Amino acid sequence: MNTLDSLQLTDNTILIFTSDNGPVIDDGYQDHAYELLNGHTPMGIYRGGKYSAYEAGTRIPFIVRWPAKVKPSKQQSLFSQIDVYASLASLLNQPLRKGAAPDSQ
């Protein structure tokens, strides 16, 4: 972000920070996942993990930085990453090919 700022590209650049949902600790593999945690709690204060409907399995970060268009705020609304594809295409006035991103709106 500092480089974008120094090159004066910040206002015309969309930065999106996001992640996949939920940690996987016990998925049946012999990968020493529990031992490698070493006290780290990847699900934080939440219950569950990947493959669960609990909050640690469904919460994701989604941070957008685009100073020219997006005012800093915090939303508690439900969000699906599936919609990013069509949303970015629309934002950039790019048509989607027929059958592309059928679940994205």
Enumerate the predicted regions with their spans.
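Substrate-binding rim/cap in mid-to-C-terminal beta-strand-loop elements of soluble/periplasmic
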Residues: M1-S6, E35-Q105
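Metal-dependent active-site segment of extracytoplasmic phospho-/sulfohydrolases and closely related
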Residues: M1-Y29
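Short glycine/serine-rich loop/turn segments
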Residues: V24-H40
